[in-house]
Amino acid sequence: MSHSPLFTSPPKSLCILRLSAVGDVCHALAVVQHIQRHWPQTKLTWIVGKTEMGLLSGIEGVELVPYDKKSGWKGVWNLWMFLKNNQFDALLNMQTAFRASIISLGIQAKYKIGFGKKRSREGQWVFVNRRVQDPETPHVLDGFMAFADYLGVPPAEMLSWHLAISDSDREYAKQFIDPTRKNLIISPCSSKAEKDWLVERYAEVANIAHQHNVNVIFCSSPAKRELEMVKKITALCDFQPVDASGKTS
């Protein structure tokens, strides 16, 4: 930490604004729970997308406020009304999308914190009064951890993710997992096809993992594009990986 921390004592309440997508929300969860471990008495409120809400449901000590982007201005207004009596010590706007910046206008917080110059996009800087320092490493998680660092939370030796997973879900997942060796789960599709990695490279990674006696599992949503992507990859594999595409949530 090369700057003075924003808080030298635990804040009473923080609001996290990260709506989507599932992968980014997973990274944000590690940061939120890291803050939670350091400041267990701080009230944490997380505004999250309706779809991503299903992933986070059941996590302890965090108030989840869902927002459906399909609800338009009515949804934004309803969100503002729901939070109108909340005065947060800080808002962590961890999403650069213009929609998130608009939502932030109706959130009452002394400090509204956004990304640094390198990562800020879509005019986010207009809607914040504090900006984190850009990390030297480019990974999404590093960008999110910069928010915890800016608040005054010490770095974590090792981050952890704790999701509320039901016993039935754990039992269902056992059919895909080999408990006698390491398991590699590959989810090759992003929300947009243009963001996807090359089919040949996924197959190459899978083949290398298999050569090291790793159980390779492919997963995806039931969407046609994603099922076809997995089919193309597995066709290039030198072995038969576990195909869980369209079978998990």
What are these regions (language model features)?
Residues 1-249:
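Catalytic machinery of carbohydrate-active enzymes
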